[in-house]
Amino acid sequence: MQAFGEGPDITPAFLVDNFPWDSLGTGTVVDMGGSNGSVSMAIAQAHPALKLIVQDRPDVIEAAKENELPKDLIGKVEFMPHDFFTEQPVEADVYLFRYIFHNWPDAYAVKILRQLVPVLRPGVRVVVNDHLLPEPNTASLTTEREVR
């Protein structure tokens, strides 16, 4: 499993450096299932004009709030409890899904994405930063066991 936890695409720096965040100006990014907010904090530090909202389950958000937010990120990174299987309440410029969909069958991934429809408008971006799984029965048995 170590191989799946390493590499340039697993670090927040890869996402921070390889998406045109500056093109959003003072836009809002919702980090869906954003856990403790570490990725949102990395984005906010590199692109201070952005506002980031970290959404996750209430228990995860409460735990995240126990950690003190760096002073330079106060007012730039917020935490909000939200179940991504319910309608998205925040209008944003980007909805970020980082390592979310590989945990769910396709039908659930579709259900998660459908919850964005009411707040989508022209120009809104849905960013998916996730593992790509090989087609079933195309990798070695060892790899299949590790990734599924």
Give short role names for the model-derived ranges.
Residues 17-148:
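Alpha-helical subdomain
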Residues 1-27:
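Conserved Class I S-adenosyl-L-methionine-dependent methyltransferase catalytic core
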